[in-house]
Swiss-Prot record:
Lineage of producing organism: Eukaryota, Fungi, Dikarya, Ascomycota, Pezizomycotina
Protein name per the record: Cytoplasmic tRNA 2-thiolation protein 2
Protein family membership: Belongs to the CTU2/NCS2 family.
Residues of the signal peptide: none
Organism: Pyrenophora tritici-repentis (strain Pt-1C-BFP)
GO CC, any one term: cytosol
Coiled coil start-end: none
Cell compartment(s), UniProt: Cytoplasm
GO-annotated biological processes: protein urmylation; tRNA thio-modification; tRNA wobble position uridine thiolation; tRNA wobble uridine modification
Any one Gene Ontology molecular-function term assigned to this protein's record: nucleotidyltransferase activity
PANTHER family reported for this sequence: CYTOPLASMIC TRNA 2-THIOLATION PROTEIN 2
Length: 380
């Protein structure tokens, strides 16, 4: 159960206002209102950049990627509430909101129905829903991505390119990794096209801890300064993680206590701790890390927070953004050391692995996901 519920609330008053408490958050008994304020404050303090600026001709626009999971929906809810508070106090807001949902070919949810509900509940913002195959249409340097699609006379449309690319991937981890990477690329392009200066990701502390270990395990640890920290990204946009100080179980408690129908907008297969697939063939690195941290946060939340706090201390080199970039994930690769042997690795998946990737501009992590056949067929 998210949070430690208090059986006898009269014996455990809220530590902040002395009203009857409803749960214990990190050893602190809190009432309903103080807990809601706790979540809001954790999020809003990360948005000092978007305070009301009376001298600005127009407010900056931010993009909120929606997955209809607990974190992204809660983030939109808190941002909408924060905007209303700004407007009631100053007559204007500090930022404009755009939201986008990327259709996942491996998920089947009623996205349009959920998006209509979100539009109705949080009106006044811009909303969009994009198919993932639009990444082949919108990415300006799409030739680099298209070169990773197996050559076939039938792969002429964006839909076909995506199908062939996904079908060419040899493991569940590879498919999950590439799909996530393509989603990020598409979200970034949509942000640029809609005039957004920043992307506000809904990653909780738990999610960022998961990402820290999974990206490292997949060979993309060098990208962590941009994947878990607030600030400029290699894409020319600012990345922000407003929920970075909130555990997923705290977001679940917030959702369950919300009085605005927040729960009806959330579509997650499992609200509690994730259970990994019983089949090792279908289990991904992301699944394992998600299962681990969602179970650890129940009794040892400080471990989860420490992982994120430590990863956030990582800094990219000053000239990192001028380095050559990976064709797939678009992350800067130090010294252009692409592929397995560029990083001095000695892992091989078969004969001629080094020559297969020798001329490919894909990083170590992406090299592990993209099969040999794909790269060798399109090698330069």
């Amino acid at each position: 159960m998210p949070g430690k519920e208090i059986v006898d609330a009269s014996n455990e008053p809220c530590r902040r206002c002395k009203a009857s408490s409803v749960l214990v958050v990190r050893s602190e008994p809190l009432c309903h209102d103080c807990f809601a304020r706790y979540i809001h404050t954790k999020c809003i303090k990360r948005l000092e950049t978007f305070r009301v600026n009376f001298t600005a001709e127009q407010q900056p626009r931010v993009l909120v990627p929606l997955s209809f999971g607990i974190s992204s929906v809660t983030l939109l809810h808190v941002l909408d509430l924060h905007q209303r508070t700004q407007k009631s106090k100053t007559g204007r807001t500090g930022f404009n909101i755009s939201a986008v949902y990327i259709e996942d070919p491996e998920q089947s949810i009623m996205a349009e129905d959920l998006l209509d509900q979100v539009r109705e509940q949080y009106s006044g913002h811009q909303y969009a829903s994009l198919p993932l195959h639009d990444v082949f249409r919108l990415v300006q340097d799409d030739a680099s991505i298209r070169s990773l699609v197996p050559e076939t006379q039938y792969a002429s449309t964006p839909e076909e390119k995506l199908v062939h690319m996904i079908n060419s991937l040899t493991s569940a981890t590879a498919r999950a990794d590439v799909l996530s990477t393509l989603k990020t690329r598409l979200i970034v392009e949509h942000a640029k096209l809609t005039g957004c200066e920043s992307i506000l990701w809904g990653d909780s502390t738990t999610r960022l801890a998961q990402k820290t270990l999974s990206e490292t395990a997949k060979g993309r640890g060098f990208s962590l300064p941009w994947q878990v920290s607030d600030g400029p990204s290699p894409f020319g946009l600012n990345f922000h993680y407003p929920l970075r100080d909130v555990l997923k179980k705290e977001l679940v408690s917030y959702m369950n206590m919300a009085e605005t129908g927040l729960k009806t907008l959330v579509h997650e297969t499992s609200i509690g701790a994730t259970q990994a697939s019983t089949s090792s063939k279908n289990t991904t690195i992301d699944d394992l890390m998600k299962q681990y941290f969602e179970s650890v946060e129940d009794n040892f939340p400080s471990i989860v927070a420490n992982v994120v706090r430590t990863a956030s201390r990582l800094e990219a080199q000053p000239d990192a953004l001028s380095e050559p970039k990976c064709s797939l994930c678009s992350m800067p690769v130090s010294g252009g050391r692409f592929g397995i042997h560029g990083w001095g690795g000695d892992q091989q998946d078969g004969d001629d692995f080094g020559s297969t990737h020798a001329n490919r501009t894909i990083c170590y992590g992406c090299t592990r996901s993209v099969p040999k056949a794909t790269s060798s067929t399109n090698g330069n």
